[in-house]
Amino acid sequence: MKNWTDVIGKEKEQPYFQHALQQVHLARANGKTIYPPQEEVFNAFKYTAFEDVKVVILGQDPYHGANQAHGLAFSVKPEVAIPPSLLNMYKELTQDISGFQMPSNGYLVKWAEQGVLLLNTVLTVERGMAHSHANLGWERFTDKVIAVLNEHREKLVFLLWGSHAQKKDKLIDRTRHLVLTAPHPSPLSAHRGFFGCHHFSKTNSYLESNGMKPIDWQI
């Protein structure tokens, strides 16, 4: 069975990837605060092995507030206030999954360890400046991640929320994977169709119908 090193190891040797790492390193060296911390940039791949991926939830770029981002899309450290988008995800879960209790924290490692790849399309951000690293080359890398999952795995669930995530639809073969789309869970758009999308129960129904263990969404 392939692992992350097999499928994207060579990508890390590409000039564009080295350039992205170098730009982030320079920014840190020049005293800028970059999130997440250096040792947590690739946490999505640390917590969810390639062969264990069942579900992919795409985010855009990391949270840009202090102590929030730790390398998993939508997730924050246990002691940090739950951000609005994640709070709306929890609200949908309380309606969608029988018995789901509103969590007291936003630390989603439990999802990641069950095979939910929480992948931001851009892996770093400067403090207080959303999308500040959007042009560093990270998206080329994360597009490759999506492409290799599409190619080398079968029957994954891709949750694409909002227009940015939905641009990645073209990288996914819908005859071999389940793609679910909805507006972004942010307070600006959640009421336009994220609430009531039932993506969490639909994900579990698909997994179970294909002989896989459902995700325990409770945090």
Curated annotation (Swiss-Prot):
GO terms for biological process: base-excision repair, AP site formation via deaminated base removal. SMART domains: UDG, UreE_C. InterPro entries: UDG_fam1 (IPR002043), Ura-DNA_Glyclase_AS (IPR018085), Uracil-DNA_glycosylase-like (IPR005122), Uracil-DNA_glycosylase-like_sf (IPR036895). It comes from the Bacteria. Keywords: Cytoplasm, DNA damage, DNA repair, Hydrolase. It is found in: Cytoplasm. Its main location: cytoplasm. The keyword DNA damage applies. Its EC number is 3.2.2.27. One of its GO terms (molecular function) is uracil DNA N-glycosylase activity. Excises uracil residues from the DNA which can arise as a result of misincorporation of dUMP residues by DNA polymerase or due to deamination of cytosine. Belongs to the uracil-DNA glycosylase (UDG) superfamily. UNG family. This is Uracil-DNA glycosylase. It comes from Haemophilus influenzae (strain PittEE). The lineage of its organism: Bacteria, Pseudomonadati, Pseudomonadota, Gammaproteobacteria, Pasteurellales.
